[in-house]
Amino acid sequence: MKTISRIAYSNDKKNKTRSILIMMSICLTTMLLVIISTVGNGMIRLQKSQAAGSYGSNYGLFVAADGTQLKEVERRAEISDIGIMCTEGILKGNENGGFVSADETVRKMLPYNQEYVLKEGTYPEKAQEIAAGRAFFDAVGYHDVKVGDTVTLEYRSGMQSEYAPVEFTVSGILYDRDEYTIEASYVVFGSQDFYNERVAEGDRQYNIYFTLSDSANVSMNNVAPVIKEIADSCGIDQKNVIINDLYLQWVLQPSYETIAVCGVLILAIVLFSVVVIYNIFQVGITNKIQEYGKIKALGATKKQMKQLIFREGIFLTFFSIPVGLLFGFLIAKCGFNWLVEQGNLV
């Protein structure tokens, strides 16, 4: 074994030009394969991330569920994450907007909207706390509001009730929209405690945002029936079930276009590399035949000849493959990050 290895190493060392060219080809091939696979995987992940920002990361939504239905949903093993949003009521001056309580899970699941993002302070936790953008506070007559300030707003719990003054403490300031095309349409966050105080237990309604766990074993082919079956078992009407199809298409269905392009490129690179390495081997093939002939004449068996040729190739890959992997990963990572940054700047 050691003799065969020494002969293989000596052969590679003797044919320096050929060995260097082969090592460069292997290194370049490895590097290109790593770059394509890494960038392709990054593109798929980026598309999924952008889908969450555009459509939200919840699998679905159960609208207007009562307390009993909420408890049933929480018991389901197929449900992974649950977020609760409640409509607090109506604030005068924000009739076309939303006054809601939303827990941290919901805020993470919602599509990106700068009006949901805190600029200062914290989201409401105590009963009388509120968070909104400065545009809202300006619209209701409070200018230069700061975190910790107290404001009195006209509030009613529903269309059937009358407005009444309620004192709130500003817990946070949200970012404002770039332009308000609809009058009195602001995002205002309240707390769950405020909702519980103002709405009787039997009248409370919850919007349940959720994702499914791996145990649900869903795909685009069966996700809708699975979600509807969960709703039925929890006593939720089908008309109150919303499935986030646009997001699920990215999460549950791979990007076939990206995979196909990467597959074609990888196949082309492999074929091209095989041709290049084959042609390099043809250089000085006469001398190699003579060398192998002499070794065989000395009594080498067919198995030993195969081992010799195999080990010559192994010695050439010891250095070239790790270098190709390293440079491929670094180039792919830096190049992909640069492309993403350029895309964000546009």
Tell where the protein language model's regions lie, with residue ranges.
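Short, membrane-interfacial amphipathic segments enriched in basic
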Residues: M1-R6, K303
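Helix-boundary and loop/linker segments of multi-pass membrane transporters
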Residues: N11-K14, Y123, P254-S255
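Hydrophobic alpha-helical transmembrane segments of multi-pass inner-membrane transport and secretion
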Residues: K16-I44, Q253-K294, G313-F327
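Basic-flanked hydrophobic alpha-helices used for secretion and membrane insertion
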Residues: N41-Q249
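Membrane-spanning helices that line or support transport/gating and their immediate boundary helices
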Residues: G42, L46, G284, C334-E341
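Short alpha-helical segment immediately N-terminal to, or the first helix within
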Residues: A139, V283, K294-I295, L308
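Short helix-loop junctions at transmembrane helix boundaries
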Residues: L325-V346
